[in-house]
Amino acid sequence: MSHVPPHVPFELSGAELRDAIVQYATNPIYHDNLDWLNHDNPYRRQLRPQVLPHLDYDKVPGRENILNYASLAVQRLLTSVYEADLVFFPKSGLKGKEEDFRAFYSPANRALGERIRPALERYAFGFLDDEVETSGTWTAQSLDAYLDSLDTAGGAEQSPVEKAILGSADRERAARMWLVQFAPDFLSEASPMMRNVLGYYGPAQSEWFKVVIDEYGYGVHDTKHSTLFERTLESVGLESDLHRYWQYYLNSSLLLNNYFHYLGKNHELFFRYVGALYYTESSLVDFCRRADHLLREVFGDTVDTTYFTEHIHIDQHHGRMAREKIIKPLVEAHGDGIIPEIVRGIEEYRVLLEIGDFDFSEQIAWMDAQPELKKLHDPVFEGLKQGKVDAPVAHLVEPRGELSNTHCHDGDELCHIVSGTMRFESGLGSSLTLQAGEGVVIKRNRLHGANIESDECVYEIHSVGDYRKCL
């Protein structure tokens, strides 16, 4: 043993990490799209590889910057890496998409993804280390008291999402945008959870598998929860093929879904998943009851809410099962030392839910405000000409059909059209037509894109930081 070389843990950072990310994302299936939607092709995901060489992946953002563009880019990357473990086929069949199928599941694509995954996870979830503290001495009794103190039943007050949708200028548009955010999770429901039912760890494993069986409709496809969600989407005029609306997924929606893949993929975080499982199953009862009422208020009797009403019953059972049949036996078997991780999983998930509520509410407000933000162009542009803000400017010339796939900026920007016509996209079903001399204020962290609708469009992007300083 004296001649054994020293062990060097794997680590990727700096230029080597950036190059590895670019190598992964330049796979042709990850290139920009010529359309806002993906059409029944679960292997194509727009990662905007042309931007990735310019991002810093080493400095973990704090919560205040977690909705910046680099985080969105990382969440899109992680979604693609995680989902290479799952089996996807187009609803219309594989014919004509065989090359994309092979490119997505190839050993090279999967190996490149796994190589960058730990660094991407550090970037995506590292901020939670500063957001959650589980110090002190924990016992089975204090854990029970903590779980009893959690308010999973909800109150009478409207949630931020309910306020955003019901207060929107276009409630149906807002509700569709909301439903689309769940597609990465609900269409492959329980897939992250499946990562934790493999292996050998005693009775709790069998209890967890019972939860999975319920999610999969007891082996009956028509009652599988993802099938129920497809019907919900279709009942409000949306398509149900996987990742059709990829470009409309918000940063926080991918963050929430990826969190469970992160916990499930890294088994050293197993007990965090146990905590997150308990909280999500317990709180989903109130969430689904509210979702049923909300969708019926917006769409009337035409909406199919069976997905949500089914969960009202089943998740009452799952919450009790997670506590009595999974958490309690695991603590008895492995001791109080695992309790801080269980609590951490709950608290981290609660932080992510807060971020998700904020992100979605801000996006709906941004979509509703498009006419006013277009009007703001003139005074903001005048302020720039007067020198109120010394803003960097990008001069762009693009041909007809050039699609700027959805992204966001880390500060406010002003889009100014010099000549030509642009369709400015601010969300699903939300767009402006901008002509020469017009423009729009682009708010920090808000998802948007653009399409050129003239033979040529000349425009400018002014990085103003805070548009109010131009007024």
Swiss-Prot record:
Q: What class of enzyme is it?
A: oxidoreductase
- The entry's Fe(2+) 3-binding residues are 407, 409, 448
Which CDD domains does the annotation name? cupin_SznF-like_C
Can you quote the record's cofactor note? Binds 3 Fe(2+) ions per subunit. Two Fe(2+) bind the HO-like central domain and one Fe(2+) binds the C-terminal cupin domain.
Which parts of the chain are coiled coil? none
* InterPro entries hit by this protein: Cupin_2, Haem_Oase-like_multi-hlx, RmlC-like_jellyroll, RmlC_Cupin_sf
Carries keyword Iron? yes
Where is Fe(2+) 2 annotated to bind? Answer: 215, 281, 315, 318
Impact of altering residue 448 to A?
Accumulates the intermediate L-DHMA, but cannot form the final product
Pathways per UniProt: Antibiotic biosynthesis
Null-mutant phenotype, please?
Answer: Deletion of the gene abolishes SZN production. Mutant accumulates L-NMA.
* Gene3D superfamilies associated with the record: Heme oxygenase-like, Jelly Rolls
**Domain comment?**
Contains three distinc domains: N-terminal helical motifs involved in dimerization, followed by a heme-oxygenase-like (HO-like) central domain and a C-terminal monoiron cupin domain. The central domain catalyzes the two sequential N-hydroxylations of L-NMA and the cupin domain enables oxidative rearrangement and N-N bond formation to yield the N-nitrosourea product. The central HO-like domain can bind Fe(2+) and use it to capture O(2), forming a peroxo-Fe2(III/III) intermediate, which is an intermediate in both hydroxylation steps.
Complexes and interactors: Homodimer.
| Name recorded for this polypeptide | Nitrosourea synthase
Species of the source: Streptomyces achromogenes subsp. streptozoticus
